[in-house]
UniProtKB/Swiss-Prot annotation:
UniProt name for this protein: Somatotropin
Localization: Secreted
Cysteine pairings via disulfide bonds: C69-C169, C186-C194
CDD domains: somatotropin_like
Major localisation: secreted
Gene that this polypeptide is encoded by: gh
Signal peptide annotation: 1-18
Keyword vocabulary terms for this entry: Disulfide bond, Hormone, Metal-binding, Pyrrolidone carboxylic acid, Secreted, Signal, Zinc
Superkingdom in the source lineage: Eukaryota
């Protein structure tokens, strides 16, 4: 009887006090989430693009190449080499800001469950925040007042140009975040055996 009580105590202790999650586990979850969001962004963009005529696609692509995304003002590495030289904290901070910048605009996206996208972005933002806190080494992450929203003028309109820009920018930014989180994970997890 004492063995049963002891076993139940140990089992309940394991449920009540689970082992803390490691950075490696958090990074794996974050990379998995952003990979999912990047796939959703790609699918949504290509679905929208394929609904357009070939001429409309060509015109919108030409216009988009001249325009820039509202998130372009977030300073980020410009190429693979600069990304690899960036600190883990810098990559996490940029990723956090990019994810945060899409929490509101993601509600206007078409081609997917917008609530699901917004929820995944919020979960990812929290996960990145936890990773930043675990890796900050006493440095201030950034002030709480740094929150911002991208200024997409006419969210939810039926204007193909605006929707094209919104989807293209979402796809571009999710690709950036996926790259930055993958590089940071590889740098902190030698067992990940990553080639960048």
């Amino acid at each position: 009887m004492e063995k049963v009580v002891l076993l139940l105590s140990v089992l309940s202790l394991g449920v009540v006090c689970p082992q803390p999650m490691t950075d490696s586990q958090r990074f794996s979850i974050a990379v998995s989430r952003i990979h999912y969001l990047h796939q959703v962004a790609q699918r949504s963009f290509f679905t929208f693009e394929s609904s357009l005529s070939a001429e409309d696609q060509r015109q919108l692509n030409k216009i988009f190449l001249q325009d820039s995304c509202n998130s372009d003002y977030i300073r980020s590495p410009i190429d693979k080499h600069e990304t690899q030289r960036s600190s883990v904290m810098k990559l996490l901070s940029i990723s956090y800001r990019l994810v945060e910048s899409w929490e509101y605009p993601s509600r206007a996206l078409i081609g997917g469950s917008t609530n699901q996208i917004s929820n995944k972005l919020s979960e990812l933002k929290l996960g990145i925040r936890l990773l930043m806190e675990a890796n900050q080494d006493g440095a201030e992450i950034f002030p709480e007042s740094s929150a911002f929203q991208l200024d997409y003028q006419s969210l939810g309109t039926d204007d193909p140009r605006q929707m094209y820009e919104l989807l293209a920018c979402f796809k571009k930014d999710m690709h950036k975040v996926e790259t930055y989180l993958t590089v940071a994970k590889c740098r902190l997890s030698p067992e990940a055996n990553c080639t960048l």
